[in-house]
């Protein structure tokens, strides 16, 4: 039993060390100008690996954004519209405010602190940011362009404890190279009766 515990402990230490080194490397890549010529083939493999890991490890906390981003890995997604039925976003105060004041389709953009881990809005904000909310035929729909901006630095860490900055332009590089594929996600739920 002691041998198993020691191996488990060493495996966890190794995973933590690799994870920390990966975060440092990702931070280094994020500091470069976002231009295709700035990244070697090996750098793109590093970014792609981080992208896949980010989706796999983030899925338990952020299943919707992991779903959106993972589908970008499939060439068959390119240019498509994919509809997902889920009411996960209806509990958001931000979304409820938009529905309470709805008169026409509205583009969604949360305040910057909404993306911070621990904020009650971060799961919905990450999945639906830049989307357009509209109500039609008793349904609430949010159309989200699943594509990466060339320049956008997002802080996903815990304030005062952990600073995890993600330069989304790194994923834009993969998109430009055809390694990931943009599409439109449409999240749909029944309009709540108020």
Regions found by a protein language model. Give the residues of each.
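Catalytic toxin/effector domains delivered as secreted proteins or via bacterial secretion systems
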Residues: 64-71, 76-194
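Prokaryotic Sec-type signal peptides and long signal-anchor helices
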Residues: 8, 13, 24, 30, ...
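N-terminal Sec-pathway targeting helices
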Residues: 1-18
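Early compact domain cores of eukaryotic multidomain regulators
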Residues: 33, 40-49, 53-66, 70, ...
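Membrane-interface motif at the C-terminal end of an N-terminal transmembrane signal
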Residues: 18-34
């Amino acid at each position: 039993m002691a041998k198993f515990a020691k191996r488990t402990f060493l495996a966890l230490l190794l995973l933590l060390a690799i994870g920390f080194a990966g975060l440092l490397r990702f931070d280094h890549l994020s500091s470069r100008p976002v231009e295709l010529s700035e990244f070697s083939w090996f750098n793109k493999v590093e970014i792609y690996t981080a992208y896949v890991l980010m989706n796999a490890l983030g899925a338990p906390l952020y299943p919707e954004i992991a779903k959106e981003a993972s589908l970008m890995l499939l060439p068959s997604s390119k240019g498509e519209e994919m509809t997902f039925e889920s009411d996960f976003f209806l509990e958001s105060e931000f979304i409820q405010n938009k529905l309470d004041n709805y008169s026409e389709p509205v583009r969604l953009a949360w305040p910057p602190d909404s993306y911070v881990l621990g904020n009650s809005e971060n799961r919905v904000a990450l999945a639906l940011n830049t989307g357009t909310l509209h109500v039609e035929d008793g349904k609430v729909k949010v159309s989200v362009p699943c594509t990466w901006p060339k320049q956008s630095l997002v802080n996903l860490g815990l304030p005062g404890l952990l600073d995890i900055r993600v330069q989304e332009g790194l994923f834009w590089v993969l998109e430009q190279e055809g390694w990931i594929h943009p599409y439109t996600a449409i999240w749909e739920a029944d309009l709540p009766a108020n």
